[in-house]
Amino acid sequence: MIIKVCGMREPENIRAIEQAGADWMGFIFFPQSARYVSHRPEYLPEQCHRIGVFVNESSENILLKAQEFGLHHIQLHGRETPEQCRKLKATGLGVIKVFSIAQESDLQSAGCYEGVCDYFLFDTACSGYGGSGKPFNWNILQAYRGKT
């Protein structure tokens, strides 16, 4: 199991989460998010993997943020194509692709990303991007047949 805490911005929170033993820490680079990180915090975790969360961002901007923040993985919440994911992965970044799930048929959208991404994140379907804090019916995942 991997424990990831997302939406980190404040140095004291970053230190506390790192000391609590989180494996991964997420930084949101989506300007419409209340937890958007507009600049590099005074402190970045040294013991947690740093994850950059992006929505419909250009590969160029993703790579700039990856370098600035020393990201290990990128988490993609938008309409990123398998080809964009493949090219980003080729740079050495781990790629996490997010899929919104409301019903079993939503799992099919992951198929063309199989073998391209390192991880899939299945999230509750909602009107916006990112987590809603609400669980979906996890029994739906029993129908998932992918390997990622």
Where are these regions (language model features)?
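Conserved N-terminal beta1-alpha1 strand-loop-helix module at the mouth
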Residues: 1-148
